[in-house]
Each structure stands twice: as structure tokens, then as C-alpha cells.
Amino acid sequence: MQDIIRKTRNRVWSRSYRAPHMYNDSTEEVASVFDEPTKSLIYSRFANPTVMAVEDKIAELEGGVGAMCTTSGQAATLLSILNICKAGDSFISTTEIYGGTVNLFSFTLKKLGIECIFVDANASDEEIDKAFQPNTKAVFGETIANPALTVLDISRFADIA
């Protein structure tokens, strides 16, 4: 994929690609995308040079090996939990989160067999510790929380975990 992006980057700034469809040299090249998705670009919903440039820059700035951009915070939240938890797992979330996320955690993930245990961010250390189960895989919180604008004490939760 880097070669594809590199072809578009011989300028001071990255070009913005607004077209949903990408040009390919042959139908064989297009067909190969479905066998090996990193080989070529076909349609911007799968990948496009603009998003890939942003992902590369974020990874570089953060010192990471990669990054993933999503079209919404809900998509990012869902993907983060699904990459850590599977059916039968649980995770802890503070109650001070966006209402749509409460719905995602309480209903959607429950249908997939993933349990969310909600705790108040201001609960005692003992109450938070008690929420952890043997199958707890993650802790989720927002900072600055929506809509309360509270700041989560991440280090406190990390110490308890």
C-alpha cells in the first residue's frame, strides 16, 4: 500500500481524493484486490490514499506501527472493544460516557455475548476493584467525558486494574 500512497505524495502536501472509485489498469488488478486487499485500491470505502496518508502520519507521530481512521467515534469504540473482547468476555466502563456508547455497550455488545460492567468513575477503589472479573479484558472511559465534561483519572483505574 505504501507504493500506492508514495505515487501520490511527491508534493509538499498530500492530495485529497474525493472520488469513491479508484482507477485500476485491468480487471485482473481489480479482481486481485479481493484476494489480497493491500495490493491495490478499488473503492474509497475500503481504503483511499487520503485516509491512508492520515493513518500513516498518526502512526508516525505516535511512534506506532499503524493507525486506523474510522468515520465516527462509535465505529472507533466498537472496533476497539471487538479487537480486545470476544463472546464470554467482559470489560469495565465508567458511567460518564456518551449516551450512544451506553446503548452500544448495554445492548449491541450484549447480543454478541460481551458484558459491560459499568462503574462510577468516582466510586471507591474497592468498588472499582470489585467490578473486575476473571474474564475482564479492558477498561473503557472517556476523557473529557460527554456530556458531563468530567476528566477521568486514568492512572487511578490503571493502578486498580
Stretches found by the model and what they are:
Residues 1-38:
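N-terminal glycine-rich, Lys/His-bearing helix-loop that initiates the first secondary-structure elements
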Residues 25-78, 100-109:
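Conserved N-terminal alpha-helix of the aminotransferase class I/II PLP-enzyme fold
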Residues 58, 76, 91, 139-142, ...:
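Buried hydrophobic positions in well-ordered alpha/beta secondary-structure cores of metabolic enzymes
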Residues 83-101, 120:
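Conserved PLP-anchoring active-site segment centered on the Schiff-base-forming lysine
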Residues 86, 132-139:
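Short acidic/histidine-rich motifs immediately flanking catalytic phosphotransfer sites
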Residues 98-99, 125, 144-149:
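Short, small-residue-enriched loops and turns at beta-alpha junctions
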Residues 107-108, 112-123:
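A glycine-rich helix N-cap at a beta->alpha junction
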Residues 145-161:
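Active-site core of PLP-dependent enzymes with the aminotransferase class I/II
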